[in-house]
Amino acid sequence: MAATKEAKQPKEPKKRTTRRKKDPNAPKRGLSAYMFFANENRDIVRSENPDVTFGQVGRILGERWKALTAEEKQPYESKAQADKKRYESEKELYNATRA
């Protein structure tokens, strides 16, 4: 019975790939509408619930974000659009100076 099964070959160790380091002068990515909402409301949630953990704060913020109507989300969406335009213009300038 042992003769019919092949002996296991030792596996070759996987090579670790190293990530390329980010350029510290590269422009920061634009924030999403949710991130603008979370940054604005995080302290409010913490003051209302002083005993919750970091993860629970995020969960509460997520629930509040889902409960917002499209009209209530609009100010955050417009901030996200403006930040996206800022990022794109900074990225174009950055790429032009790199090339």
Curated annotation (Swiss-Prot):
Q: Which PANTHER family match?
A: HIGH MOBILITY GROUP PROTEIN DSP1 (PTHR48112), MITOCHONDRIAL TRANSCRIPTION FACTOR A, ISOFORM B (PTHR48112:SF22)
Q: What are the GO MF terms of this UniProt record?
A: DNA binding, bending; sequence-specific DNA binding
Q: What residue stretch is flagged as signal peptide?
A: none
Q: Where, subcellularly, is it found?
A: Nucleus; Chromosome
Q: How does it assemble?
A: Weakly associates with the stable SPT16-POB3 heterodimer to form the FACT (yFACT or SNP) complex, which is associated with nucleosomes. Multiple molecules of NHP6 (NHP6A and/or NHP6B) are required to recruit the SPT16-POB3 heterodimer to DNA.
The main location is nucleus
Q: What is this protein called?
A: Non-histone chromosomal protein 6B
Disordered: where is this region? 1-31, 69-99
Summarize which parts of the chain are annotated to bind DNA, as ranges. 27-95
UniProt keyword Disulfide bond, yes or no: no
Pfam families (UniProt xref): HMG_box
- Record's miscellaneous remark: Present with 4590 molecules/cell in log phase SD medium.
Q: What does this protein do?
A: DNA-binding protein that induces severe bending of DNA. Required for DNA-binding by the FACT complex, a general chromatin factor that acts to reorganize nucleosomes. The FACT complex is involved in multiple processes that require DNA as a template such as mRNA elongation, DNA replication and DNA repair. Also augments the fidelity of transcription by RNA polymerase III independently of any role in the FACT complex. Required for transcriptional initiation fidelity of some but not all tRNA genes. Seems to be functionally redundant with NHP6A.
Query: Which InterPro entries does the annotation name?
Result: HMG_box_dom (IPR009071), HMG_box_dom_sf (IPR036910), HMGB (IPR050342)
Q: Superkingdom, according to UniProt?
A: Eukaryota
State the UniProt keywords alphabetically: Chromosome, DNA damage, DNA repair, DNA-binding, Nucleus, Transcription, Transcription regulation
> Which ranges are annotated Basic residues under compositional bias?
13-22
- Which cellular components does GO assign to this protein? chromosome; nucleus
Key word DNA damage present: yes
Protein's GO biological process = chromatin remodeling; DNA repair; maintenance of transcriptional fidelity during transcription elongation by RNA polymerase III; RNA polymerase III preinitiation complex assembly; transcription by RNA polymerase II
Q: Which Gene3D superfamilies match?
A: High mobility group box domain
Biased composition (Basic and acidic residues) is annotated at 1-12, 69-93
- Classification of source organism: Eukaryota, Fungi, Dikarya, Ascomycota, Saccharomycotina
Instruction: Give the similarity note.
Output: Belongs to the NHP6 family.
